[in-house]
Amino acid sequence: MVTLQELYDKIRDKVQDAPVYRGAINDWWGNGVGSTPYAVKHYKEAVRLNHICDRLEEKTGVHNAELVKAYGDNSLLYAEHTWGHSATVTNPYDTMVTNLDMRKNSYASKAHEAAAMRKNEQCHLLGDILRYYNLSGKVKAVSTSHEKRVFPVEFYVETMSLPAVKVTDDKTNEVMEVQLSTHPRGVLVSFLAEFEPMEEKTFTYEEQPASVQTLFTRTAWVGAERVRDIINTYDTESYKLPYGMENDSFKISWKVGEGITSFYNKKAEVEMCKPGLETFFTPVYECTKIRKGVYEERRLIGRNIRGLHAEQYQGDLKDVRILDHGPVFTKVELVFDLEGTYYSSVIIKMYNKLPKIEFSYHIAKTLSEDIESVFMPLALNLPDAEVSIQNGGVAMRPGIDQLPGTNMEYYLADEGLIYRTKDQTILVLSLIHI
């Protein structure tokens, strides 16, 4: 018996011309990560917090080796453990199995705790008090980017009511365009600001009286029942929101009963929405019924984690809810009927003055012992684009930089994917990393 390194030493001269492939192998583990979205989301936020702290240390010069080690040890243990002791298939209700699952998730939680404590320490060194109860005060925003750019800035005030607020850049005296929205612990204050590389900015915020609503506008823009469905020149956006949203870069259109009908790139003048099960912003449920016993059925599904008798269902758009609409962003919830779920919705947040869209998927899953998958398609209709995903710590091109003959049904993207054309680059960044 030899180690892999010893084997390579023996065959080194014979494999000089062997092809080199980059990225992780698409296999059961790539699929398994998606089976535990809550724990993975918790773990990946710990990874992001750790990267942020690395940047903040460049400013503070303080390095907490104990917390770094606690994060590193626990994140490694979580990432190394596989998604499934064999007994999770044959004996999912066994106490040993549930204990192993909780123990595994605890590694993610310990890693997150260490990273969060490290971030709190770094923020405290930069002057943060961590909690904001005052209706007027100062906040500091720190860019962790090495590039100059405009970023969304958000902070919340723990209060029952904040009718309006004025935010001023202390350095330039610029009054920022602000949007207030609800937050689980109070009021969220959002605005856009430009930062130099790694710049710190201080802003003063002051409570303001509620703005006076003018009733007589000489324009019919809202009905007596307070529904804003009248085409007018006074409010040129509200009556469009039940059917779509747009900014200078993108336009998204939908229709109840039909779903997403358009995802248009206004800069490139390209329709990016693909038809069928690849439609963007639209969840897909897939189910392989257990017919021959759970262990045998899972053996037969192979690398694609899909039985030959698998059925696929696409979400059916049933409702549209306008959650937020203001000078900084618009947020809309699209509610879908989807097989295998009690509740299924996609929340889209579009910034008015940034070429940026944020979206999240909310799901309440039904319980089943069948083999199931829920997908959010990230495919765009850009046939001339080169597609790359961050996989295994390196960038790889699906179908090109991978072992010949391996599956192409799904990919594990560490940080998302990039569509690159000669004129534009579109980044789809996955925060949950499924």
Q: What is the meaning of each model-derived region?
A:
Residues 1-131, 140, 144, 190-196, ...:
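Active-site and substrate-binding clefts of carbohydrate-active enzymes
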Residues 1-2, 160-162, 384:
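Structural alpha-beta junctions
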Residues 10, 150, 369:
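Active-site-proximal flexible loops/turns
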Residues 14-18, 38, 64, 72, ...:
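Generic structural signal for short, flexible, solvent-exposed coil/loop and linker residues
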Residues 15-17, 156-158, 375-380:
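Short secondary-structure boundary/capping segments
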Residues 65, 77-363, 374:
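Catalytic and substrate-binding regions of extracellular carbohydrate-active enzymes
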Residues 353-395:
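Acidic (Asp/Glu-rich), glycine- and aromatic
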